[in-house]
Amino acid sequence: MMTNTAAYQFVTIRDPQTLAASVLAQAEQHALKGSVLVAEEGINLFLAGAAEQIGAFYTWLQADTRFAQMRIKYSESKHQPFARLKVKIKREIISFRRDDASPLQGRAPSVTPAVLRKWLRNGQDDRGRPLVLLDTRNAQEVRYGTFQGALTLPIDKFTDLPGALEPHRAALADATVVSFCTGGIRCEKAALWMQADGMDNVLQLEGGILGYFEEVGGEGYDGRCFVFDERVALDPELNPLVDADRTA
């Protein structure tokens, strides 16, 4: 049985090369596979391995005070969903190319999965404002599933979002906008950019879709959540669409 993890942390990294080398060495020592991106703005990890080895790796990582508060999302599969281990140094841990959307300067307000579920049941937020759920993922991901009634955009990559959102600005003005993505990392930047661009009614879904599945299940969500590995997508119980032995 494999333990699959997704985690990220926006934090100033003054030594990305040193951190990347240490992460690679530790991940190899624990026989983990997956992908890790390191940048001056933080770290983004998708790793899988035996439960004991995953636990040892994250115990090591979170002993570093920069990552002590990192939230890790877990799921299981029978087989390893990654072919290899890759650790790369990038300009951003999620590319958006907007200087006014740096989570290092602070976070946009967020909403927990439990509160969002309540709002979905009521059809409005606690102030009686209508809800708009904004899917910040690309069109390929959306095809596997999204929240019921969500605003989805015809984009191929995250950097396309600002232009694609422009025609919808007027419709969003009187609503509470909840931005969401797979695990929360894109929402962090999207919500900040929207605020900087004059939209002060924007929240981000804490933990993204996977956090919502983990905490409250699939209420209000249609389909699965696409993931960037050989499992392809996860259902609201975090079961993989594909769980094949790639060595067979």
From Swiss-Prot:
Alphabetical keyword list: Oxidoreductase, tRNA processing
Alphabetical list of PROSITE patterns matching this protein: RHODANESE_3
Root EC class: oxidoreductase
Domain Rhodanese as annotated: residue spans: 127-221
Function (record text): Catalyzes oxygen-dependent 5-hydroxyuridine (ho5U) modification at position 34 in tRNAs.
Membership in a protein family: Belongs to the TrhO family.
Protein name: tRNA uridine(34) hydroxylase
Organism: Xanthomonas axonopodis pv. citri (strain 306)
Lineage, opening ranks: Bacteria, Pseudomonadati, Pseudomonadota, Gammaproteobacteria, Lysobacterales
